[in-house]
């Protein structure tokens, strides 16, 4: 990995606390793409929004569960952020319950498993 790729990787690691293996590869092979992606993500997440940040994080956790129900750590991470920003456990549960019909039981289970871990850790 060249110096530019290393800088992108380190910046991403410090902001997120983790780097997906695919993003590590992109830092190595196409750091310009990672920079453009991160700039777009930072713009979207950083702009003034009518939607409360707690809902944005909750939506992200639901979207991750829909796209990849086995991404437990990522679902949990965004649920934790949402809860820290003011979402209740009940709101988190209801977000996942609301997508049962269009998305299926596996998505609800993925959300419930992540939420259960959080509730258990808080006890």
PLM regions and their residue ranges:
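Amphipathic, charged-and-aliphatic alpha-helical interface segments
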Residues: 55-71
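Acidic, glycine/proline-rich low-complexity segments that act as flexible tails and inter-domain linkers
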Residues: 1-55, 84, 110-123
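Mid-chain, well-packed structural core segment of small domains
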Residues: 67-93
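Substrate/cofactor-recognition hotspot
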Residues: 98, 103-106
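Amphipathic alpha-helical segments within well-ordered protein domains
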Residues: 41-45, 60, 79-83, 93-97
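Residues within well-ordered alpha-helical secondary structure of globular protein domains
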Residues: 29, 39, 61-64, 98
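Alpha-helical scaffolds flanking conserved acidic
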Residues: 52-59, 89-94
